[in-house]
Amino acid sequence: MSSDEKGISPAHKTSTPTHRSASSSTSSQRDSRQSIHILERTASSSTEPSVSRQLLEPEPVPLSKEADSWEIIEGLKIGQTNVQKPDKHEGFMLKKRKWPLKGWHKRFFVLDNGMLKYSKAPLDIQKGKVHGSIDVGLSVMSIKKKARRIDLDTEEHIYHLKVKSQDWFDAWVSKLRHHRLYRQNEIVRSPRDASFHIFPSTSTAESSPAANVSVMDGKMQPNSFPWQSPLPCSNSLPATCTTGQSKVAAWLQDSEEMDRCAEDLAHCQSNLVELSKLLQNLEILQRTQSAPNFTDMQANCVDISKKDKRVTRRWRTKSVSKDTKIQLQVPFSATMSPVRLHSSNPNLCADIEFQTPPSHLTDPLESSTDYTKLQEEFCLIAQKVHSLLKSAFNSIAIEKEKLKQMVSEQDHSKGHSTQMARLRQSLSQALNQNAELRSRLNRIHSESIICDQVVSVNIIPSPDEAGEQIHVSLPLSQQVANESRLSMSESVSEFFDAQEVLLSASSSENEASDDESYISDVSDNISEDNTSVADNISRQILNGELTGGAFRNGRRACLPAPCPDTSNINLWNILRNNIGKDLSKVSMPVELNEPLNTLQHLCEEMEYSELLDKASETDDPYERMVLVAAFAVSGYCSTYFRAGSKPFNPVLGETYECIREDKGFRFFSEQVSHHPPISACHCESKNFVFWQDIRWKNKFWGKSMEILPVGTLNVMLPKYGDYYVWNKVTTCIHNILSGRRWIEHYGEVTIRNTKSSVCICKLTFVKVNYWNSNMNEVQGVVIDQEGKAVYRLFGKWHEGLYCGVAPSAKCIWRPGSMPTNYELYYGFTRFAIELNELDPVLKDLLPPTDARFRPDQRFLEEGNLEAAASEKQRVEELQRSRRRYMEENNLEHIPKFFKKVIDANQREAWVSNDTYWELRKDPGFSKVDSPVLW
C-alpha cells in the first residue's frame, strides 16, 4: 500500500474489506441499480407512522451501468423494517474544499448511528472540535465508482468526498449505505426523531432539513407532508384561506402527541396481556390456598418507599414528552370500588388510583410467598397500565383542543373568502387602470421638452479628501423613470435598520466554489476593436441617429399574465437520472421557465449601468475601482426572488437587442455555440463599453443545483484608457425538490485594470455557514501596488454595497424597489418586466432571430401554457434537425455578429464584429439570410 493510501486509511479499523463475499457483491450490484422514488401515502399504509417520502422505495429501477457515471444509492424500501444496528466506522477521506483553500484536503471522518462527523484529526473529534456533521439518512447519496467519489447532498450543502484506495472506497460505500438505511429506519419507527433535525442547533449542525419539510421564518410551509394532497399555491387562494389551511397543515404535521399516544397504547396492550396471565395465576392460587381477599390486599398497599416512587417518576418522564406544555388534570375517585379486574371496565383509569406496591407485604396472615410475589407484580404492572392510559388520555385531550381551535379558525376564515375575492378583483382592476394611466403619463412625458438637469451624487471619501463630491450629469427623464430608486448618498443607517431574511443552514465549513478563477488580460487586438466605439456611440446618441423610433420611455409596468402553479410537477422523476450531470441538455417542462431567456439575463446585468457612467467621470483610480466593483455586485441582485424558475435556453443563432435612451446604452447578444452553450453580448455607451461571453454548466446533486459560469466580463472606460476584467462566482439553488427554493452566490471575484497596476479589487461572496448569519454577504477590499488596503467594502448583494467602516460608511449602490405583486410575476424587477416587450414600431426593426419573436416564450408570458409547451417542443425539434443536417454535411455554424479571438492567456473569447448596428440602420435585417429558428 502506498504512503498516500496509508494516509487515508482509518485510524481505528472496523473490518478490512480486502475480499468481498459473493453475497455482498451481489448486494452492491443490486444497490447500484436502485434509485429513490417518491411514494405517496395510501390508505393501506394508514397505520404506519408518517415518514418522509425520500425514505421509502418501490421496486428498484436500473440506472446507468457505466462505471464512470454517477449512481444514486437507494434508500429504505417498502416493508424493510429490520435493519441491524451498524458498527461505528471511522477513518480518513479526502474532502473537496472550496475557497479560499481549493482542492482536496484530508479529513478524519466518524460514522456513528447514521451521523457522519468530520474534523482535521482524530484528536479534534475527541476534543469535540467538529468541523461539520451530516445526517446521511436525510441526504441524497451518489457515487462514482471509477473516480472513487462519494457525494452527499443535504439540500443546503453538497459534500464532495473521495477515497484513494478502492478497498476503502468499497468499505465506506458499504458502511454509508448500512448507516443510511439504519438511520432512515429509525426515522420511520420514530417520526418525531426526524423533527429534532428540522431546526439546526446553534452550537452544532448535526442535521439538515428533511426532504419534504420546509421551514421558513419559523413556520411550516404547505404541502410538506406526504399524506396530504398538494395544496393550491398562494397565488390562486385568498390569503385568509391559505392561512387557515396552513394552520391545519401544521397541526397534521405536528403529530407528536398522537405518536406518543399510539406508543403508550401499544405498551399498555402488552402490559394488559401480562396482567391477564397474572390474574389467572392468582385465581388458581386463591382457589387452592386460603389466600386473602385481593381488594383487602390493595387497601394495605399504601406504604410507598421513596425508591419505588423515584422509579415510577422516572418511567413517567419517559412516557411524557418534555415538549408538552399543556397538562390536563383528570379527576380520580378518592375511594376504590371493588371491581373484577379480569373483566372489561372502560372507566378503570378514572375509578382507580393505583399506588406503588411495597417491596414486601407485612400481613402476618399471608404465608404463601408465590402468591405474594404475584400480587406485587400484578400491582406494579397495573400501575404502569394506569399511567399509560392516563398519558394517552391527556394526549388525546390535547389534540382534541388543537383540532377544535384549528377548525374554528378555518371556518372563520372561510366566512371572509367571498369578501376577499371581491376585494382582490377590485384591486386587480385598480392596478390595471393605474398601469394604463402611468403608461399614458410616460408617453406625454416623453413627448414634452425636458431640459437635462444636473444631480449631485456623493462619492466615496478618500482618506485625504474627505467630504469632496463629484458631479455627474443625469437626465431628468431618468430620475422620473427611476423615481423609486434610492439615492446613493442616503444614510448608511438605513442599511443596518433594513429587515434581513435569514435562512437556517446545515453544518459546513466556510467553503465556496471550487472552479478556478477565470481572469485573463484580453489581447491588444480586442482593445483596438473597441477603441473607437465610444466616440461613435456618443455622436449617434447626441444626434439622435440610433434608430428610427426605437427609443421609448412609455414602457410597460406589468406582465400580461401571472406565473403558473408548479406544485403538481414532480421534479424528482425528471432529475433523478441526471445527478452530477450537466442539466443544460435536459428538457424541462415549460411551467418551470420564466418568460425570459439567457440572452436577456445578460442584459439584466446592465440595469445599474449608471455606476459605470459615474466611474467614467471619476478621476481617482481607487474610486473608479470601487464603482466598477459595485457594478459587478449589482448584476446579482435581480436573482434574489428568481429561484423558483429558470430562463429559456437560447437556440443556436438566437439574438436579442435592447436600446435604452434613458440609460444611454445599446445592447445586443447572440447564442454563438450550442454544445457547449456559449452566450456572448456587447453593450455600448458614450461613457463605457461592456462585453462578455459566458459558458454555463448546470449540475444537479440530488437536492441542490450548482450553476458554474466560465468566462470573463470586460469593461472599458475610454476617457481614462482603463480596461477592467473580472470573473463570475458560483450560483447554487437549494431545496430543488421540496420546500421553498432559495438561491446563493459564493466565491471570489478579482477585478483588475489590465492597463494600469495602480490597484486591484478582491470581492468575496460569503457562503452560508452554521456558526453565524451571513446570508448573501459580500466583503471586499481595494488594494494598492504595495498591498495596502485603500478602501474596504461590505454589504449584501441583494440589499446594497457600502464603503468604509460602519457607522460612517457611505452607500455606493442600492437596488431599486420591487414592483407591486412581484411574487405573482416570476419575481421580476421593473427592468426585467420591460425586456421582452414588443410593440409594432420595434417589430419592424428587429432581426427575425430576436428572442422577442420566440413563440414558446411569448405564450408563457401571456399565460397560455398548453401552446407554450407545444411550441417549446417544436422549437427544440427544429434545433435538433438543424444540428443533424449540419453534422451530416460537415457544416459549422458561424455566428453573424460575433467573432472568435484568442486572448492573452491563449483562451477563446467572443467579441463583436461591428456589423449588428450597421445592418440595422437601413433597416437591413430583412435583406440578411437568417435561419428559421421557430
Swiss-Prot record:
It is a peripheral membrane protein. Belongs to the OSBP family. The modification Phosphoserine is found at residues 35, 190, 290. The lineage of its organism: Eukaryota, Metazoa, Chordata, Craniata, Vertebrata. Residues 86-181 form the PH domain. The modification N-acetylserine is found at residue 2. Residues 1-62 are annotated as: Disordered. It comes from the Eukaryota. Residues 30-40 have a biased composition (Basic and acidic residues). Induction: By acetylated low-density lipoprotein. GO terms for cellular component: cytosol; early endosome membrane; endoplasmic reticulum membrane; nuclear membrane; perinuclear endoplasmic reticulum; plasma membrane. This is Oxysterol-binding protein-related protein 6. Keywords: Acetylation, Cell membrane, Cytoplasm, Endoplasmic reticulum, Endosome, Lipid transport, Lipid-binding, Membrane, Nucleus, Phosphoprotein, Transport.
